[in-house]
From Swiss-Prot:
Keywords: Ribonucleoprotein, Ribosomal protein. GO terms for molecular function: structural constituent of ribosome. It comes from Francisella tularensis subsp. holarctica (strain LVS). GO terms for biological process: translation. GO terms for cellular component: cytoplasm; ribonucleoprotein complex; ribosome. PROSITE patterns: RIBOSOMAL_L36. Transmembrane segments: none annotated. This is Large ribosomal subunit protein bL36. Disulfide bonds: none annotated. It comes from the Bacteria. Belongs to the bacterial ribosomal protein bL36 family.
Length: 37
């Protein structure tokens, strides 16, 4: 899980979602998981 100021899609499988006012990226590749912090 990477914590970043700006979350971006890193591949075509990445999805940007909002969960409890937190922007997250979920992906099939676990190294691409991010959240905004």
């Amino acid at each position: 899980m990477k914590v970043r100021a700006s979350v971006k899609k890193m591949c075509r499988n990445c999805k940007v979602i909002k969960r409890n006012r937190v922007v997250r990226v979920i992906c099939t590749d676990p190294r691409h998981k991010q959240r905004q912090g």
